[in-house]
């Protein structure tokens, strides 16, 4: 699960956990949610605990079903099967599911988000090298990290603010869309899990960038808009690999996502499913 966007990478990145149960995600969020004294930004606080929230019966939700990838193209067959299966399960549990799309230009957002992450990567690397008392050195990091670092050094202040403004505009459009829906259901990634080594951070930088850009598909949209989101494994390929489905909700409504995920976990348990090695 990824909670509301906070301060990391200009708001694009928020740390949480990869867990095997909704209970663990809820409990960890109870342990970490809320601002520290002096934080310049803060997400809305949850009334009560997230662990208590997942124990309550979920209310009926209006769910927008996205059946296209970030380019507006048809999904990979496994991903399409995953979201359709999840939609049927949600419908069987009493939720209202209909095909709808916030119609945000995810392709145009990519290079703008890349500016933000590159500039923040450059700052993080410089801080680390300073703490170590060393000069920036390509041998200290992966080739991809070094390329992103170099890009970040060249991002101007105006370019950075333009990118932040674009993310904020996308967030406002997403918020307007979510006045009509509680949750957006989409694929998590563009395809089934790739083989180890497919994303080689010490390989060709252009190849890595192209592969990551295509594989992440719709999830970077929610990094930009700040909407909380959660992925759950409701579909498995014939050879036993999990294909995630992705639920995104309104700003400040992590409890809605966790409650829905808990309901899905009860209806279709995944805890004991482990891919064959």
For the regions a protein language model found, what residue spans apply to each?
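A short helix-breaking turn/cap at a secondary-structure junction
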Residues: 1-81, 85, 127, 259, ...
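Short glycine/serine-rich loop/turn segments
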Residues: 1-15, 66-69, 118-119, 188-207
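Short, well-ordered beta-strand elements within core beta-sheets of diverse protein domains
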Residues: 13-20, 150-155, 247-248
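Short, well-ordered beta-strand elements
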Residues: 17, 241-250, 257-258
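Short, surface-exposed loop/helix-turn segments at secondary-structure junctions
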Residues: 41-45, 111-116, 162, 194-216
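Short helix-loop capping/hinge segments that flank enzyme active sites or metal/cofactor-binding pockets
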Residues: 52-67, 116-175, 187-191, 228-234, ...
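Short, Asp-centered acidic motifs that coordinate Mg2+ and/or phosphate
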Residues: 182-184
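Conserved short alpha-helical elements in the N-terminal third of ANL/AMP-binding
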Residues: 221-224
């Amino acid at each position: 699960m990824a909670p509301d966007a906070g301060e990391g990478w200009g708001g694009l990145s928020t740390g949480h956990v990869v867990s095997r149960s909704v209970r663990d995600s809820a409990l960890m969020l109870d342990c970490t949610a809320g601002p520290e004294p002096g934080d310049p930004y803060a997400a809305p606080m949850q009334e009560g605990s997230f662990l208590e929230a997942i124990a309550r019966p979920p209310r009926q939700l209006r769910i927008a079903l996205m059946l296209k990838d970030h380019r507006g193209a048809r999904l990979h067959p496994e991903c399409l099967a995953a979201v359709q299966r999840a939609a049927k399960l949600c419908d069987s549990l009493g939720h209202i599911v209909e095909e709808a799309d916030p119609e945000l230009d995810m392709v145009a957002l990519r290079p703008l988000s890349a500016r933000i992450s590159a500039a923040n990567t450059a700052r993080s690397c410089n801080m680390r090298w300073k703490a170590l008392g060393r000069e920036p050195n390509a041998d200290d990091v992966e080739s991809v990290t070094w390329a992103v670092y170099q890009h970040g050094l060249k991002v101007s202040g105006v370019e950075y603010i333009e990118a932040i403004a674009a993310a904020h505009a996308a967030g406002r459009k997403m918020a307007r869309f979510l006045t009509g829906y509680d949750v957006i259901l989409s694929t998590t990634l563009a395809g089934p899990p790739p083989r180890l080594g497919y994303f080689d951070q010490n390989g060709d930088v252009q190849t890595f960038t192209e592969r990551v850009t295509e594989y992440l598909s719709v999830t970077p949209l929610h990094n930009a808009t700040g909407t909380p989101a959660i992925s759950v494994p409701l579909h498995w390929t014939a050879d036993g690999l999990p294909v995630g489905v992705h639920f995104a909700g309104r700003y400040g409504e992590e409890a809605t996502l966790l409650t829905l995920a808990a309901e899905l976990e009860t209806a279709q348990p995944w805890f004991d499913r482990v891919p064959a090695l």
